[in-house]
A protein has these predicted regions:
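Long, helix-rich interaction regions
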Residues: 70-132
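Short coil turns that connect the paired helices of HEAT/ARM alpha-solenoid repeats
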Residues: 19-22, 52-57
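Membrane-interacting alpha-helical segments
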Residues: 11-30, 77-92
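Amphipathic alpha-helical scaffolding segments comprising HEAT/armadillo-like alpha-solenoid repeats
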Residues: 8-16, 40-49, 75-79
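Structural detector for internal amphipathic alpha-helices that build alpha-solenoid repeat scaffolds
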Residues: 1-5, 17, 28-38, 61-72, ...
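Boundary/linker segments of alpha-helical solenoid repeat arrays
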Residues: 56-62, 75-76
Length: 132
C-alpha cells in the first residue's frame, strides 16, 4: 500500500529506520531490502551498524549479499570511521563469545569475523590499512 505513495529515496529511508527495530525479524527484512536496492552510500552505515549485533541470521544475510561483491565503499566507510568501526568489531566478538562460541568454537570460522575481514576490511592487527 505505501510504495505507491513514497519515492524511491523515501522507501530507502523507511528501510533504514526499520533496520533499527527492536524485532530482529523486522531488522533482517529491512536490511535485506536495503542490500537488494543497490545500497546508496548514505545508507551503508545502517548495514555496518547492524553487523555488530547478536542476531546470527542478520550477519549471515549481510555476508551472503556482500560476499564476492566489490566492498571498497564499505571498507572506505569503515576506515574513515575507524574508532567507531573498531568498537563495533569488539561488540561483535563479545556477542560471539557470549552466544555462539560453543557452536562456532573457532572464531576464524564465525561469520561475523568473515564479514568484518572480507567485506569491511578489518585486518589482523586492527590498524587502519588506508593511508591518507
Amino acid at each position: 500500500f505505501f510504495p505507491n505513495k513514497l519515492t524511491e529515496r523515501q522507501i530507502l529511508i523507511y528501510h533504514c529506520i526499520f533496520s533499527r527495530s527492536y524485532d530482529g525479524y523486522i531488522r533482517q527484512k529491512h536490511i535485506e531490502a536495503l542490500l537488494d536496492a543497490n545500497t546508496p552510500e548514505w545508507a551503508m552505515p545502517y548495514i555496518v551498524k547492524i553487523c555488530d549485533e547478536y542476531v546470527y541470521a542478520i550477519l549471515e544475510t549481510v555476508y551472503q549479499k556482500l560476499q564476492g561483491e566489490n566492498c571498497e565503499k564499505y571498507k572506505m566507510l569503515c576506515q574513515l570511521n575507524f574508532d567507531y568501526f573498531k568498537l563495533g568489531h569488539c561488540r561483535m566478538i563479545s556477542y560471539w563469545n557470549e552466544y555462539y562460541r560453543y557452536d562456532y568454537y573457532r572464531y576464524k570460522e564465525y561469520i561475523g569475523k568473515k564479514l568484518y575481514g572480507e567485506c569491511f576490511g578489518y585486518n589482523k592487527t586492527g590498524q587502519k590499512s588506508i593511508q591518507f
